[in-house]
Amino acid sequence: MHPRKSTKILNKKHKGGQRRTRKNGMKSLHPNYSNTTKSHLVRVFLEILNMVKLYHWKTHSYAQHKATDELYASMNEHVDKFIEVLLGKDTKRIKMMEKKIDLIDPTNLSDFKSRIYEYREFLTDMNLYFNEKADMDILAIRDDLLMDINQFLYLMTFNK
């Protein structure tokens, strides 16, 4: 079902009071946050934060240096809040399944911005995995991360 369909259709119950899931076309009101999912989110968040900090140290532009510094600080705060809220949903700690993270080392601004666009798409796709009703807190923090990225991309349009 397309995510933009009316909430009336999305909230309609089927036989046995079931809600739509990916398998039966409905979403559960009580989502299961698997350890694998949490571990993957942590890995992606750490990779992007490290990439931003690395580019921050490498750039020769003072404006980019300041913009990446602000992006890192804001994203770091929002990532921390995102993971803590996610952990609070089921009170289970993360056992990292993915023990290695990639150190993404963009060679130039174009490569760096391309990675930022990919990360933005990763964030927008979270709507597919989180329940809009049960996870509105997590998705609100995700929106804060998107705001950080979009503001940063605007700042990157300046010449100096």
Residue positions per predicted region:
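Conserved alpha-helical segments that form or flank metal/cofactor-binding pockets of metalloenzymes
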Residues: 63-95
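Extended, well-ordered alpha-helical scaffold segments
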Residues: 48, 53, 70-74, 78, ...
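Helix-loop segments that flank and shape redox-cofactor active sites
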Residues: 47-70, 129-135
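Amphipathic alpha-helical coiled-coil segments
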Residues: 81-86, 152-160
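Disorder-to-helix initiation segments
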Residues: 30-42, 48, 108-112
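Arg/Lys-rich, intrinsically disordered low-complexity tails that mediate electrostatic binding
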Residues: 1-34
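Acidic/histidine-rich alpha-helical segments that form the ligand environment
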Residues: 100-156
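Non-transmembrane amphipathic alpha-helical segments
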Residues: 52, 82, 123-126
